[in-house]
Structures are given as structure tokens and as C-alpha cells.
A protein has these predicted regions:
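Membrane-proximal helix-turn-helix segments that form the acceptor-binding/catalytic region
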Residues: 147-189, 202-204
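Acidic anion/phosphate-binding donor-loop and adjacent secondary structure
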Residues: 198-201, 217-232, 281, 368
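Conserved donor-binding/catalytic core segment of Leloir-type glycosyltransferases
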Residues: 234-252, 258-262
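Nucleotide-activated donor-binding/catalytic signature segment of Leloir-type glycosyltransferases, i.e.
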Residues: 274-297, 371-384
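Short alpha-helical donor nucleotide-sugar binding micro-motif in glycosyltransferases
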Residues: 302-306, 393-397
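Aromatic "clamp/platform" in nucleotide-sugar-dependent glycosyltransferases that forms part
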Residues: 314, 405
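Short hydrophobic beta-strand element within catalytic cores of glycosyltransferases
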Residues: 331-334, 413, 422-425
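Conserved acidic donor-binding segment of nucleotide-sugar-dependent glycosyltransferases
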Residues: 349-356, 365-367, 437-447
């Protein structure tokens, strides 16, 4: 069987690694696999045999400019999509497995027109957020919007991803998506959390069967891994509270970490992995920032070094980081009423109400093995694309905190748990599904 994955990235980032993990599994079963991707980024050498680039960096930039000006995300990249579909027509896949279609790289109308012309193909679509059934945004829990259930006419998040700073096309986008994404034969939707599945069944995609497939981790990588992480950052006598995200913003709980940093005493330090250089420069002194890493080995070492992993995301679909932290021996804390709670409660982690005070009480009430009583600092480190570095950070931390509001399914929660670090997160989005309330916890988010 010929299988074609379509995703924004290949082999990097959470969705990129999910695609390559599935590709390896399918290839081992005797299938031929390709992964079509569009965003700039180095494909790891071991996955280059799968990779097929859609368009160029210039195409992505032009698509982004169109989005900024006309709010037409997903409807640009016509030439790039045309050339890709010529290749796909020759490849003749038996199974087309869609993942993230947003990301400034493909024209979804042209893609679905082609799919509908081939009813003989099996189609799967793994949703990692809510973009497919809204007129603009990828998450709406934090702003408490329910327009997507019937028709999006106005978006209060127009300047958030995929940001537009000029003309709004929210209403038109909603109808174009509805027309493009409905009426596909043999298509099954997959979500990594019950939370997202429930939302999907309330949208115009309700005509399709929806399956819940929880994201999994490689326990041969995410396991307790000793490292010199604490020594390198001078944290030998600190209780490390760890947070990990691909991109840090308010819905991921970044500001909850800021509040937490003001509340924790000098015994603690917060380490945040996945920050931009600009964010790191703006951090308070008691937070250590690390840039994003695509190295599972680095992540494992960080997970192992941490004392607790916290995922305060409120819109996570299904965060892998709490599970990864736990696999590395670090307990996790997440927020309730999120997808993170689903998995958290299954894996002996702590789930707390969505409130920074509850997060604080859970962290300070935890009895850490080292009995550390000296000064504490919140650590933020420049973003890293090395999973190995991330794993090392997870492991080194005492607590992983994820105060995100809108994560679909925060893999950082699973990663921190897999590395043995305790996670604390909010009970919104998919966060609830990543925490089971035994060794990690979630908090109820309140204003």
C-alpha cells in the first residue's frame, strides 16, 4: 500500500515527529510511505527518504503575506499546490493521511478538490487543533467563543495565529472551509483527545466518524537519563519546576509561569524550554529560559533533572510532555477541564483547578526527594530543536509547569512525565487528558 502523509513539517516538532513515527511503523509493515511537507526546516537525515517538499520558502512567505493582508490562510500557495498535486497524481497513494494543513504552505480547496476526484483513496485526517472548523483561529476556549458551531462572522483573535492585520475574511473563510472539507467519501477523522473529538462532533465536520488515538512516546528514548544539566546551569541545590512548549504564549500558560515565579521562594527555579531569544531576554531573573530543541535525547536529560513538570495550558489537545516527563521519572501537574487531564489521570499525575494559586499550592506541597531548602530560580533557556537536550532539561527539573490556556493536546506534558518530572497544568483544552491526578495535577483556570 502507498501512503501519503501531508503535514506542515517533517521529522521536527510534535506533529512532524508523529508523522515520521507513523511512517516508520507503516514502512515496517511493508508499506511505501512519503511525507509531503511545506514549512522551512531541516528534515533529520533518517527521515529524508520520506520527505517531499511542497513549494519553496518563497511560496510560504507569499502565503503568509496574503494572510496578513487578506485573512486568506489556507487559500494561497496555488502554484505550489498545483505542482504538488501533479506529483501526487503520479504517486497514486492508496491512503492519504492529513495532519496540519495550516502553516502557509498548501491550498486546501485545491487539495480537497483533488481528494474528492479520487473516491477510491482512503483518507484520514488527524486534527491537532480546531483550525479546520473555524473562520480564522486554531483555538477558541480562552475567549469563550462558540460561533464555530454554526457560522463564524467575527473573530476577536484576528491578530493571533494565523494573524491578519488588515481585511477580515472570517465569514467567507468559514464557508469556504465548510464547502471544501465536507462531502469527502471514505474519510475518517482522528483526534488525540476526547476533548477535541467532542468539539469536532459539534462542528460542520460531524458527518465524519471520529476516532480518538492518544499520542504515544518512545520509551526507549524517554526514560530516566542522568546528565550534567543541573551543573551546567548552576541548579544543583534548586527544586526545578519545568515547563516545555514548541511556542510559548499566553494560552500555553506563559503568564501563569510569570505569576508563579513571583510566588515561589528562593528554593525553586522555573525552567522553560521552547522560548524565543526575545522572550528569554525579557524573562524575570528567577526564570531560566532554553530555546526549543528537536532532540528527544536532550529533552530526556532535562525531564530527568527536573523535580516536577507543570503544564498550565488551557487549550492543549493532548500534550505529550507530561507523559514523557513521567517516563523519565518526573511527576507532572496539569489543569483540570483540559485534554491534558485525560492522560494525566491515566498515568498517576496531579490534576488541579485552573488557578495559579492551586498550581503554587500543589508545587510547594510536594515532597521532593532531595529535601532541597535553598534558593529557587525559575529557569528559561533559549529554544532548542534537540529532543535530547529537551529530555535532559525535563529530567533535571523539579516541576514542569504548563500554564497554557488553549493547547489541543500538549505533548510537553507527556514528555516531562516520560522523563520522570512532575507536571502542573491548567484543566483547559486537551491538558486534562494528559494528567491522571496521581503524581501530576491540573488546576482550574480562573481570571
Amino acid at each position: 500500500m502507498k501512503v501519503l502523509f501531508i503535514n506542515s513539517v517533517c521529522g521536527i516538532g510534535s506533529t512532524g515527529r508523529i508523522c515520521t513515527d507513523l511512517a516508520q511503523q507503516l514502512e515496517a509493515e511493508g508499506n511505501e510511505v512519503k511525507i509531503a511537507y511545506g514549512r522551512k526546516g531541516t528534515v533529520p537525515e533518517q527521515f529524508q527518504k520520506y520527505a517531499v517538499r511542497i513549494g519553496t520558502d518563497f511560496d510560504c512567505k507569499m502565503h503568509a503575506i496574503q494572510t496578513r493582508l487578506f485573512d486568506t490562510h489556507g487559500f494561497g500557495s496555488k502554484h505550489a499546490t498545483k505542482e504538488f498535486l501533479k506529483w501526487a497524481e503520479e504517486y497514486k497513494p492508496d491512503l492519504v493521511w492529513l495532519h496540519n494543513l495550516h502553516g502557509y504552505y498548501i491550498n486546501v480547496e485545491m487539495l480537497f478538490d483533488w481528494i474528492k476526484k479520487h473516491p477510491e483513496m482512503q483518507v484520514k485526517w488527524t486534527l491537532h487543533d480546531c483550525w479546520a472548523f473555524t473562520g480564522h483561529c486554531s483555538h477558541f476556549t480562552m475567549v469563550k467563543c462558540e460561533q464555530w458551531k454554526s457560522h463564524c462572522s467575527y473573530c476577536s483573535q484576528l491578530r493571533r495565529y494565523p494573524a491578519c492585520f488588515a481585511m477580515s475574511s472570517v465569514s467567507k473563510n468559514f464557508e469556504r472551509k465548510r464547502k471544501a472539507f465536507t462531502g469527502v467519501k471514505n474519510m475518517t477523522l482522528i483526534t488525540p483527545s476526547k476533548w477535541l473529538a467532542d468539539l469536532t462532533r459539534q462542528s460542520f465536520l460531524k458527518e465524519y466518524p471520529v476516532e480518538v488515538h492518544y499520542n504515544t512516546i518512545d520509551t526507549s528514548i524517554f526514560k530516566p537519563t542522568p546528565s550534567d544539566f543541573r551543573e551546567r546551569y548552576g541548579l544543583q541545590d534548586k527544586i526545578i519546576v519545568l515547563g516545555v512548549a514548541n511556542v510559548w504564549e499566553d494560552r500555553k500558560g506563559l503568564f501563569d509561569f510569570y505569576k508563579l515565579a513571583e510566588m515561589l521562594d528562593d528554593r525553586y527555579v522555573i525552567v522553560l524550554v521552547g522560548l524565543s531569544e526575545k522572550q528569554i531576554k525579557e524573562l524575570p531573573k528567577n526564570i531560566k529560559g532554553i530555546q526549543r530543541t528537536n532532540s528527544p535525547q536532550e529533552l530526556t536529560a532535562i525531564y530527568t533533572a527536573a523535580d516536577v513538570f507543570v503544564n498550565p495550558s488551557v487549550e492543549e489537545n493532548f500534550g505529550m510532555t507530561p507523559v514523557e516527563a513521567q517516563a523519565c521519572g518526573t511527576p507532572s501537574i496539569v489543569y483540570e477541564d483540559t485534554a491534558c487531564e485525560e492522560i494525566a489521570r491515566q498515568n498517576g499525575n496531579t490534576v488541579v483547578p485552573q488557578d495559579v494559586n492551586a498550581l503554587y499550592e500543589s508545587i510547594t506541597g510536594h515532597k521532593f526527594a532531595g529535601g532541597v531548602t535553598n534558593k529557587c530560580t525559575i529557569i528559561c533557556i533559549p529554544r532548542t530543536n534537540s529532543p535530547q537536550e529537551l529530555a535532559a532539561i525535563y529530567t533535571a527539573a523539579d516541576v514542569f509547569a504548563n500554564p497554557t490556556y488553549e493547547d489541543n493536546y500538549p505533548t510537553v506534558n507527556l514528555e516531562a512525565q516520560a522523563c520522570g518530572t512532575r507536571v502542573i497544568t491548567y484543566d483547559t483544552g486537551g491538558c486534562r487528558e494528559t494528567i491522571d491526578g496521581k503524581t501530576c495535577e491540573y488546576l482550574t483556570k480562573t481570571k
